[in-house]
Design a protein with these regions (language model features):
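Extended terminal accessory/targeting regions
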Residues: 1-179
């Protein structure tokens, strides 16, 4: 199978043209786990709603408080240009949730990322870089999440750590912390 080409990527279009009223629900509040790995805990629920006219094509997404995410999965060598906590933070968490939950097609999850970044006024070139990165290379993360879930891993906490140095790897070994 050859390398995907630029022409094989279809950027989602917003009905009615242009940006509709913002559909991000609640700002994202996260806390970083301790340790070397970059894992974050979503402190409050967030959500995303389709723009008016797009309700038939896209479905709302609600991310529960306690969801554990790596935010934007950007390779370390791109962090100066695309930090994992950029303007697209909210969209990255929604996207991580959709990739974890897998209740909809991967293409829809990627399109929701694009639309949410558009509504959050993320610059076009940044949106393109992130969208194309996940759209062309996200299958590995999608498959890895499916395998982790099948093996019993959970990503939604009911109990949050109060120790700032506890790592995600340590915390997830405690059976009484999951929702």
């Amino acid at each position: 199978m050859g390398k995907p080409t630029q022409q094989s990527i279809e950027i989602p279009r917003l009905k009615g043209g242009g940006i509709q009223p913002r559909v991000a629900v609640h700002p994202a509040t996260v806390t970083r786990f301790g340790g070397e790995a970059m894992w974050f805990l979503l402190r409050d629920p967030i959500g995303w709603r389709p723009n008016p006219g797009d309700e038939q094509q896209y479905h709302p997404a609600d991310v529960p408080a306690g969801f554990v995410t790596d935010l934007a999965s950007v390779p370390w060598y791109l962090w100066n240009w695309l930090p994992n906590d950029g303007l697209y933070l909210h969209a990255a968490i929604i996207h991580d949730w959709l990739y974890w939950d897998q209740a909809r097609a991967r293409d829809e999850a990627d399109n929701v990322l694009w639309i949410d970044m558009t509504d959050l006024k993320v610059g076009y070139l940044t949106r393109q870089a992130i969208y194309q990165g996940v759209h062309l290379r996200g299958q590995g993360a999608w498959d890895a999440n499916a395998a982790l879930k099948a093996s019993g891993e959970k990503r939604v906490l009911k109990r949050f750590p109060d120790d700032p140095v506890v790592s995600w790897d340590e915390w997830k070994k405690r059976p009484d912390v999951f929702a």
